[in-house]
């Protein structure tokens, strides 16, 4: 407890020295941030490239620690009292505070600094060697050198690297906001608590432990802002008030004990990829998208009136999105994408059986495996949903095992499925009418109006992706708002991930607005 008190005292002292009084008639927070950005665009792009050059896969313990230390030092340089928190066997959590004298509202800021694993062979450039393009690659953009001081930066240019969109962009945007405030004497209207997660892409398995171990550090927070995710598919900025939960399972079916010559044994030995496809087809209609697992939709919590109204007000963009993605149809038509995201989903996220392409051989594969991705909505429990899927597999006549079957098991059961995985976390949702959330909506709406025109902000009941936000509503008992800034076509989780520079500029403006929003702040 002494450590926590000392940290708060140091943060308060630093803030008092950091923020000088602002003369009457001075620029607003967003104006100060915009002026700073316009004068330093080239340097900001280079700083972003430096951040992106730090490898950040959670399982790479050496580099993930280097990344955490770099971010800690960058936060410290702009006046945040930052340090690394530790629990056994986990990447460090970057924690920081900025205490504002007289502030009566405390905002928590969540960002994750880890990224998805990479396969360099799939990338046009090395994933941790950031490369600037004049436009998106798909729009015939060309690679260019990072800008020198004074050089113009085209807002339509894009920087390509792992985590450019998910989720280092918020870090690259919040740092110049705090630096601009420091240099201009602008005082935030809220105390700030920073939490940077180092294993979100791995499911944040230690986040609960961090929240419980250091509970006193999070208790002052009134509202959590989650800086993660993409803009609406229409390109308009959005706020989201919920996220889907997630879980994964892996299913393997078996034939012979080894791969067999397809000439000698084909048309006789079990064709395991086809057997697996039949099992998967029994789980879901590939055209309607309906999951056929009994009870899959039974625990879905109905949307409230405010969520239904928000859904009805969303811009119609499905047809344009289909054209952009080269699709003539979608699952569940005529339901919209936004409506479909309000339901749990089952996706076949990967399949393996022998080899393809240049490595293909004339064999009957001895086994075939599918990785299942299941997204959850409010009301779904991960363990319960796993149980439903396993019950469905058993109804198809399978004996379920947890390890590869031995010969005795193979000769006892005709149909065997190894089922593993199943961890994950539930969905979370906050009320859009919460007073603190209404403050965020007002500030974000003003920022969106300035950048995109009046009425541009989209309010979405829940993001399609997943974040462990249930820990903040269920463990810390605090509301949250998700504040996405990445372009919707940022290739999140895929090769050639990127960020459109205009989205970085908007993030700077938006964060400046949130950090200086009125009501409930300075007394």
Task: Report each predicted region and the residues it spans.
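Bacterial N-terminal signal peptides
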Residues: 8-21
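Sec/Tat signal peptide C-region and signal peptidase I cleavage site
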Residues: 22-26
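Acidic/His- and Gly-rich active-site-bordering loop/insert found
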Residues: 27-164, 171, 183-190, 372
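An extended, acidic, His-containing surface patch that forms the Zn2+-binding/catalytic region
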Residues: 103, 233-234, 292-367, 375-392, ...
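Acidic, glycine-rich active-site loops and adjacent beta-strand->loop/helix elements
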Residues: 113-115, 195-204, 227-232, 255-257, ...
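Acidic/histidine-rich catalytic neighborhood of metal-dependent amide-processing enzymes
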Residues: 152-242, 522-523
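A generic structural motif
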Residues: 165, 257-259, 265-266, 373-382, ...
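Polar, glycine-rich mid-to-C-terminal structural blocks
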Residues: 256-320
């Amino acid at each position: 407890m002494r450590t926590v008190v000392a940290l708060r005292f140091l943060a308060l002292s630093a803030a008092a020295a950091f923020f000088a009084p602002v003369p009457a008639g001075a620029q607003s927070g967003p104006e100060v941030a915009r002026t700073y950005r316009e004068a330093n665009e080239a340097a900001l792009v280079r700083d972003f490239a430096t951040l992106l050059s730090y490898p950040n896969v959670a399982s790479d313990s050496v580099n993930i620690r280097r990344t955490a230390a770099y971010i800690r030092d960058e936060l410290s340089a702009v006046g945040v009292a930052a340090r690394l928190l530790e629990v056994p066997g986990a990447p460090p959590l970057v924690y920081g505070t900025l205490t504002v004298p007289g502030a009566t509202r405390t905002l928590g800021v969540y960002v994750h600094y880890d990224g998805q694993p990479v396969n360099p062979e799939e990338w046009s450039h090395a994933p941790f060697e950031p490369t600037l393009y004049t436009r998106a690659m798909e729009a015939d953009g060309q690679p260019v050198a990072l800008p020198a001081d004074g050089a113009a930066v085209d807002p339509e240019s894009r920087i390509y690297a792992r985590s450019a969109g998910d989720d280092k962009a918020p870090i690259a945007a919040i740092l110049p906001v705090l630096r601009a405030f420091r240099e201009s004497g602008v005082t935030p209207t809220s105390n700030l608590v920073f939490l940077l997660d180092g294993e979100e892409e791995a499911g944040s398995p230690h986040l609960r432990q961090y929240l419980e171990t250091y509970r006193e550090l999070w208790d002052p927070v009134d509202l959590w802002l989650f800086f993660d995710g993409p803009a609406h598919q229409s390109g308009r900025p959005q706020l989201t008030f919920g996220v889907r939960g997630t879980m994964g399972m892996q299913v393997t079916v078996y034939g012979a004990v080894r791969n067999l010559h397809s000439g000698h044994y084909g048309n006789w030995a079990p064709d395991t990829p086809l057997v697996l496809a039949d099992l998967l087809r029994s789980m879901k209609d590939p055209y309607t998208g309906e999951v056929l697992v009994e009870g899959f939709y039974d625990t879905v919590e109905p949307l409230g009136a405010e969520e239904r109204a928000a859904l009805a007000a969303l811009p119609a963009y499905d047809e344009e999105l289909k054209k952009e993605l080269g699709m003539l149809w979608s699952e569940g038509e005529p339901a919209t994408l936004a409506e479909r995201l309000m339901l749990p989903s089952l996706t076949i996220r990967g399949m393996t059986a022998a080899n393809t392409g240049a490595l293909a051989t004339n064999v009957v594969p001895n086994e075939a495996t599918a990785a299942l991705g299941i997204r959850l909505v409010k009301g779904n429990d991960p363990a319960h949903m796993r149980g439903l899927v396993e019950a469905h597999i058993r109804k198809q006549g399978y004996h379920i095992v947890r390890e590869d079957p031995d010969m005795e098991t193979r000769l006892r059961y005709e149909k065997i499925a190894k089922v593993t995985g199943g961890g994950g976390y539930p969905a979370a949702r906050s009320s859009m009418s919460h007073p603190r959330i209404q403050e965020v909506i007002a500030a974000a709406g003003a920022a969106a109006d300035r950048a995109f025109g009046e009425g541009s902000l989209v309010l979405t009941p829940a993001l399609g992706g997943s974040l462990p936000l249930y820990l903040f509503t269920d463990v810390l008992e605090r509301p949250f708002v998700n504040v996405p800034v990445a372009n919707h076509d940022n290739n999140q989780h895929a090769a050639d991930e990127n960020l459109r520079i205009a989205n970085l500029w908007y993030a700077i403006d938006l964060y400046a607005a949130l950090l200086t929003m009125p009501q409930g702040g300075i007394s």
